[in-house]
Amino acid sequence: MIRISDAAQAHFAKLLANQEEGTQIRVFVINPGTPNAECGVSYCPPDAVEATDTALKFDLLTAYVDELSAPYLEDAEIDFVTDQLGSQLTLKAPNAKMRKVADDAPLMERVEYVLQSQINPQLAGHGGRVSLMEITDEGYAILQFGGGCNGCSMVDVTLKEGIEKQLLNEFPELKGVRDLTEHQRGEHSYY
């Protein structure tokens, strides 16, 4: 479910040494399954453990996850990274905003999942997003861009070199992607 690197475990163990005996950590998601989902880590004293929690035992600590957050923390990773600028704890939870779909789910659901969990977070940096409108009988994913992507002069490159390559790599049954958007250049456009 959650992978916690050795460096992150050592960091948590150091912090936990200053807490009440038996205190561990809790990993959670606020507003799971929504675009506003946020992940967090907090102290979890012994009296805060619920019967419905999942206990994930690691070498140096135990991480508790509440029942509601658990499916959204699938494939999550916590690391403690040190570079020239200092150290920071990172928590990556690719399924926090949308629950992972099964490998045998319909193609439309699997493509939508990749768009929402992998592609849209990248486009969001430019204020953009992409939506799956349909998959044609011929195997083309019909997409619509919004936000900063609408009217952006780089949208063709994003579509062909970024999105299409990634989707065709993950879904060989697709023939390609097409853009349905009526692009209108304006102040909202990124480039």
From Swiss-Prot:
The residues forming the signal peptide are: none
Q: Which cofactor does it need?
A: [4Fe-4S] cluster
Q: Pfam families, from UniProt?
A: Fe-S_biosyn, NifU
Q: Which residues form a coiled coil?
A: none
Q: Which cysteines are joined by disulfide bonds?
A: none
The free-text cofactor remark is: Binds 1 [4Fe-4S] cluster per subunit. The cluster is presumably bound at the interface of two monomers.
What does the entry list as the binding residues for [4Fe-4S] cluster? 149, 152
Tell me the keywords, alphabetical order. 4Fe-4S, Iron, Iron-sulfur, Metal-binding
Sequence intervals crossing the membrane: none
Origin superkingdom: Bacteria
One biological-process term from Gene Ontology?
iron-sulfur cluster assembly
Instruction: Report a single Gene Ontology molecular function.
Output: 4 iron, 4 sulfur cluster binding
Under the subunit heading, UniProt states: Homodimer.
- Family membership noted in the UniProt record: Belongs to the NfuA family.
Q: What does this protein do?
A: Involved in iron-sulfur cluster biogenesis. Binds a 4Fe-4S cluster, can transfer this cluster to apoproteins, and thereby intervenes in the maturation of Fe/S proteins. Could also act as a scaffold/chaperone for damaged Fe/S proteins.
Protein name according to UniProt: Fe/S biogenesis protein NfuA
Organism in which the protein naturally occurs:
Salmonella arizonae (strain ATCC BAA-731 / CDC346-86 / RSK2980)
